[in-house]
Amino acid sequence: MSFSQEPIPEVRSEWSIAAHGPDTPFRHWTVMQKYISDLIQRNGYQDYVEYNTTVERIEKEGDQWKIILRKEGAESDYWWKEYFDAVVVASGHYSVPYIPYIEGLEDLELQRPGSILHSKMYRGREAFRGKRVVVVGASVSAADIAVDLAGVAQSPVHAVVLGHKANVYFGDVAFKHPEIKEQRSISHIDTSRTVHFEDGGRVDDVDHIIFGTGYSWSLPFLPGVEKDPTLLFVGAVGAGLTFKIFEWQAVLAARILAGRARLPPLEEQQRWEADRIAARGDGGGFTLVFPEFEAYFETVRALAGPGVEGKGRQLPKFEQAWFDAFMAGHERRKALWKRWNAEGRRAKL
């Protein structure tokens, strides 16, 4: 899902072609990294970026925002402050791993440092070859890792998925591999490295527990969510057709700050929020765009408008083909898992 005027390069890895065919829609992470880097560097945009810098705090002072910044130095860190008329928070929400509380988990990590990790830290199967592994999570990260370890880690790979809701796109097909054993939630872990499950089952001498349990929303630099018209958030959504949804939001945010677009009265915005909470709840479902892609994209496009005197990027109308391609990619992934499952079953004959 590229930006509307900047197509993603047609560079496909040998692995992706072998797995999904010559028309594979998937790209290696290095291709995506270069895609984003090239966008920043064109037209001198990189001159507006302060690299290797953390935002430590944002707070409103009068009619401006005070930003406290920090850059690491060889002997000491350099701290400074700058002032801005507006702030756009576009820091994402896949940074701080979420690991649920499990009795004995912290003790296991203290006893065997490195035995507990999150999918964010997973860098391939070789570190787990011949190891006894438990994978926790019922969504795509846990599925990818469990399948990747099947036939490499000690068999079976134990996947904590039973009793948990499967990912709406992928279901539970990945966990049906013959080298994966589905388990219920972990009740506790004892000092002998035994993982106990809620149904009374257990796995002894566990080497690693890998969590594919998502991320926590974190804004440590913003001590309180300010209700201020000059504080905007871009990308605070889930399941929303990356990168297009970021583009739509960014265009709207830029036009609001430039005075070329206006939001409706506050009362109407509050009604939007109330209606969405009533329909989706105030948890993770609140931020999910799926399956209402067209309604969301067209609402944002209408709010952004064409800009004053045609200035700025013109957002195209939502195309059903975008959604179809999005879903087709998921079907390719499921087809790959089914093929691997079948190969695994044949290997056991």
List PLM regions with ranges.
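FAD-binding beta-loop-beta segment adjacent to the flavin cofactor pocket
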Residues: 1, 102-109, 218-231, 240, ...
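Feature captures the FAD/FMN-dependent oxidoreductase FAD-binding
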Residues: 14-86, 91
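Glycine-rich dinucleotide-binding loop and its adjacent helix/turn
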Residues: 28, 32, 63, 86-149, ...
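C-terminal, flexible cofactor-proximal segment of oxidoreductases
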Residues: 230-349
